[in-house]
UniProtKB/Swiss-Prot annotation:
Entry GO CC: nucleosome; nucleus
Tissues where this protein is expressed: Testis.
Family in the record: Belongs to the protamine P1 family.
InterPro entries, A to Z: Protamine_P1
GO molecular function: DNA binding
Protein name in the entry: Sperm protamine P1
Organism expressing this protein natively: Dasyurus hallucatus (Northern quoll)
UniProt KW keywords: Chromosome, Developmental protein, Differentiation, DNA condensation, DNA-binding, Nucleosome core, Nucleus, Spermatogenesis
Main subcellular location of this protein, as a coarse class: nucleus
GO BP: chromosome condensation; sperm DNA condensation
Amino acid sequence: MARYRRRSRSRSRSRYRRRRRRRSRGRRRRTYRRSRRHSRRRRGRRRGYSRRRYSRRGRRR
């Protein structure tokens, strides 16, 4: 049983390490995506009316 416990501990550690690596990568990608989304949102705010009209036309069609 002691051996099994040691193995489970090592496995959980390896999994935690992998998750940490994925999180660091996701953080970098998220920051890039957020910056892009913010720029798109700013443009959408300026053209909010035109976008609404287009969506209404699309729904009618």
